[in-house]
Amino acid sequence: MALPGARARGWAAAARAAQRRRRVENAGGSPSPEPAGRRAALYVHWPYCEKRCSYCNFNKYIPRRLEEAAMQKCLVTEAQTLLRLSGVQRVESVFFGGGTPSLASPHTVAAVLEAVAQAAHLPADLEVTLEANPTSAPGSRLAEFGAAGVNRLSIGLQSLDDTELRLLGRTHSACDALRTLAEARRLFPGRVSVDLMLGLPAQQVGPWLGQLQELLHHCDDHLSLYQLSLERGTALFAQVQRGALPAPDPELAAEMYQRGRAVLREAGFHQYEVSNFARNGALSTHNWTYWQCGQYLGVGPGAHGRFMPQGAGGHTREARIQTLEPDNWMKEVMLFGHGTRKRVPLGRLELLEEVLALGLRTDVGITHQHWQQFEPQLTLWDVFGANKEVQELLERGLLQLDHRGLRCSWEGLAVLDSLLLTLLPQLQEAWQQRTPSPVPGG
């Protein structure tokens, strides 16, 4: 397949060559020379699906008719506009999510990447991820996405049980999933991630562990475990509400998660985030930006972003949400160059709350250096060092606070939500009192 432009062809070839030379061995790769405010990840939302899954409440639509050329033009325009408004000079990763972006034309993916390459620097080892569903991504189509510049796939496998797949409203079978996974690994060796869900109605620990063991015979170097969340407004929620299905058992889900983590550790996977496991250094660079509270631009209907617009003097980060409905979003992009519906300036405390809640999702946690990038006056020791409730969490081995920073233990990662019930109020209280003290041993 031909790409729409020689620059995109050259960039895709360079990316593939760099990918052969080396793998990303740590989160974020080599330090970038640009200041943090000039760097960002880019998320591109494709809002369309073949059908709505029974558990999903994401911003997605079943198109009655689709003029992809118009959608492509608007995605390109909004990407260019947001890059200009943000002053971002280096894009460190691109993630095509949805919806089902594997339903988009590879030409659309190539056009977006070409536009971004014209507006910002793209490193040769740029991670470009595409979410794919097995039924919308036969091998020939995956190869075309590779030619367009995609070098990493995230496959929504969800289950290897056909009964569970039907319950979830998925359009693929377990055989479809494994066939697509095998083809993806052939085309993108070492760069394929799969999702596996747990905590479904009537799901039992033993059969689910059997699925995980089976998946280990087929998967690549990245795997995500996600617990089902029953969302109001979904078909699955309604079935549980009216008693047609049993409510998921949270204790069984917790056991699945704990035993699943142990199985993956024995298989050589490193848990680098609450839901994510990797081996051979195959971490998700794009998602790492989220967990480290880096800047990211959200392009497409309903996309979310976090960046400092140039008009704000480059000092106030904003949370941004694009217009949800695709037709309205396209009208706004054609009129204004972007479809931003909501802008919320983030105060310093709000930003620190995000740094805390997101950073503790990772095994690295929050280093002192990283914290000081967001709050140079109030240290982690100031906030958490003398609090009795936090000390109890440290003594129970759920948290660690030392010369490296603040992080969860292996046991603590599994109960992070409960830890944040203590940590976030303590941060808020310390912020109100703000009386920095010397660092122990400093």
Curated annotation (Swiss-Prot):
<dbReference type="GO" id="GO:0020037">
    <property type="term" value="F:heme binding"/>
</dbReference>
<keyword id="KW-0479">Metal-binding</keyword>
<dbReference type="GO" id="GO:0005737">
    <property type="term" value="C:cytoplasm"/>
</dbReference>
<keyword id="KW-0496">Mitochondrion</keyword>
<keyword id="KW-0004">4Fe-4S</keyword>
<feature type="binding site">
    <location>
        <position position="195"/>
    </location>
    <ligand>
        <name>S-adenosyl-L-methionine 2</name>
    </ligand>
</feature>
<dbReference type="GO" id="GO:0046872">
    <property type="term" value="F:metal ion binding"/>
</dbReference>
<feature type="binding site">
    <location>
        <position position="170"/>
    </location>
    <ligand>
        <name>S-adenosyl-L-methionine 2</name>
    </ligand>
</feature>
<feature type="binding site">
    <location>
        <position position="131"/>
    </location>
    <ligand>
        <name>S-adenosyl-L-methionine 1</name>
    </ligand>
</feature>
<keyword id="KW-0349">Heme</keyword>
<feature type="transit peptide" description="Mitochondrion">
    <location>
        <begin position="1"/>
        <end position="17"/>
    </location>
</feature>
<dbReference type="InterPro" id="IPR013785">
    <property type="entry name" value="Aldolase_TIM"/>
</dbReference>
<feature type="binding site">
    <location>
        <position position="43"/>
    </location>
    <ligand>
        <name>S-adenosyl-L-methionine 1</name>
    </ligand>
</feature>
<feature type="binding site">
    <location>
        <position position="158"/>
    </location>
    <ligand>
        <name>S-adenosyl-L-methionine 2</name>
    </ligand>
</feature>
<feature type="binding site">
    <location>
        <position position="56"/>
    </location>
    <ligand>
        <name>[4Fe-4S] cluster</name>
    </ligand>
</feature>
<dbReference type="InterPro" id="IPR007197">
    <property type="entry name" value="rSAM"/>
</dbReference>
<feature type="binding site">
    <location>
        <position position="49"/>
    </location>
    <ligand>
        <name>[4Fe-4S] cluster</name>
    </ligand>
</feature>
<feature type="domain" description="Radical SAM core">
    <location>
        <begin position="34"/>
        <end position="270"/>
    </location>
</feature>
<keyword id="KW-0949">S-adenosyl-L-methionine</keyword>
<feature type="binding site">
    <location>
        <position position="53"/>
    </location>
    <ligand>
        <name>[4Fe-4S] cluster</name>
    </ligand>
</feature>
<dbReference type="Pfam" id="PF04055">
    <property type="entry name" value="Radical_SAM"/>
</dbReference>
<dbReference type="GO" id="GO:0005739">
    <property type="term" value="C:mitochondrion"/>
</dbReference>
<dbReference type="InterPro" id="IPR034505">
    <property type="entry name" value="Coproporphyrinogen-III_oxidase"/>
</dbReference>
<keyword id="KW-0143">Chaperone</keyword>
<keyword id="KW-0809">Transit peptide</keyword>
<dbReference type="GO" id="GO:0051539">
    <property type="term" value="F:4 iron, 4 sulfur cluster binding"/>
</dbReference>
<comment type="similarity">
    <text>Belongs to the anaerobic coproporphyrinogen-III oxidase family. HemW subfamily.</text>
</comment>
<keyword id="KW-0408">Iron</keyword>
<feature type="binding site">
    <location>
        <begin position="99"/>
        <end position="100"/>
    </location>
    <ligand>
        <name>S-adenosyl-L-methionine 2</name>
    </ligand>
</feature>
<protein>
    <recommendedName>
        <fullName>Radical S-adenosyl methionine domain-containing protein 1, mitochondrial</fullName>
    </recommendedName>
</protein>
<dbReference type="GO" id="GO:0006779">
    <property type="term" value="P:porphyrin-containing compound biosynthetic process"/>
</dbReference>
<dbReference type="GO" id="GO:0004109">
    <property type="term" value="F:coproporphyrinogen oxidase activity"/>
</dbReference>
<dbReference type="Pfam" id="PF06969">
    <property type="entry name" value="HemN_C"/>
</dbReference>
<dbReference type="InterPro" id="IPR004559">
    <property type="entry name" value="HemW-like"/>
</dbReference>
<comment type="function">
    <text>May be a heme chaperone, appears to bind heme. Homologous bacterial proteins do not have oxygen-independent coproporphyrinogen-III oxidase activity. Binds 1 [4Fe-4S] cluster. The cluster is coordinated with 3 cysteines and an exchangeable S-adenosyl-L-methionine.</text>
</comment>
<dbReference type="InterPro" id="IPR010723">
    <property type="entry name" value="HemN_C"/>
</dbReference>
<keyword id="KW-0411">Iron-sulfur</keyword>
<dbReference type="InterPro" id="IPR006638">
    <property type="entry name" value="Elp3/MiaA/NifB-like_rSAM"/>
</dbReference>
<feature type="binding site">
    <location>
        <position position="98"/>
    </location>
    <ligand>
        <name>S-adenosyl-L-methionine 1</name>
    </ligand>
</feature>
